[in-house]
Amino acid sequence: IARKKTNQNCAVMIAKGNVNGIEITAGAINFDFIGGSCGAAESEAIIYGVQHAIDNQTPYVFFPCGGGQRMFESPIALAGMTRTTLAINELKKNKLPYISCFTDPTAGGITASFAMLGDIHFAEPGCLIAFAGKRVIKATVKEELSADFQTSEFCEKHGFVDKIVHRKDLRKDIGNILSILLKKQSEVTSGSLNETSENIEPFTKAAS
């Protein structure tokens, strides 16, 4: 039913494109596909996106959405949290920027894995960003929670989101931050090479 409704094989879509002339790999979760829940196929798609970014040396921009792991699919869905986390770590080892752009709602195992691992976190205004539900947390801590608890505004205030950006402005902000990150990375790499060359020179002379 979900495939017929969305014309997709799974909830995750992966694409390539460019922002400000910068080639990127992008991914998004379609909430209309079983509530954006992540099963085995979705995890594979996210990992494929990471591999595409590494193979093509592009930043990875992802738009998470959904209620978490698709547990009726078996523990394989839960294992997707670990697998996607390990994949994002590989992206970071390759020094490629990873930007997570939270959409409404982002919850459960999605929040607790790849969605919260971005170098930069953008969020649309008023998004629900959570792991467990508000009532569950309230019952656990036995305290009153603020009205904006688990919203993108609350997350920004507490350091989990870098900036709240309206969808119409996302392209501009993503382009700006990627330009800064890639320029800085280029300068750092260049500096490291120069430093390495200076360090190697005395050893070269000693060996000659």
Where do the PLM segments sit?
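Short flexible coil/turn linkers enriched for glycine and charged/polar residues
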Residues: 8, 19-22, 94
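A secondary-structure boundary/capping signal
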Residues: 27-30, 125
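A structural preference for short, pocket-lining loop segments at secondary-structure junctions
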Residues: 17-28, 45-70
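Conserved mixed alpha/beta catalytic, RNA-binding, or beta-rich assembly cores of soluble enzyme
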Residues: 31, 38-47, 55, 66, ...
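Short beta-strand elements
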Residues: 15-18, 120
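Conserved catalytic cores of soluble enzyme domains
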Residues: 67-185
